[in-house]
């Protein structure tokens, strides 16, 4: 349903931001 799609998108979005933060703090991916 729509809710699952929204939750999925939110999870991907959050993981993406966390990944970028980790790259900045860690100095590379």
Curated annotation (Swiss-Prot):
Expressed by the skin glands. It comes from the Eukaryota. GO terms for biological process: defense response to bacterium. The keyword Disulfide bond applies. It is found in: Secreted. GO terms for cellular component: extracellular region. Antibacterial activity against representative Gram-negative and Gram-positive bacteria. This is Brevinin-2Tc. It comes from Rana temporaria.
């Amino acid at each position: 349903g729509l809710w699952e799609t929204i939750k999925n998108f939110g999870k991907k979005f959050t993981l993406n931001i966390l990944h970028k933060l980790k790259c900045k703090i860690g100095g590379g991916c």
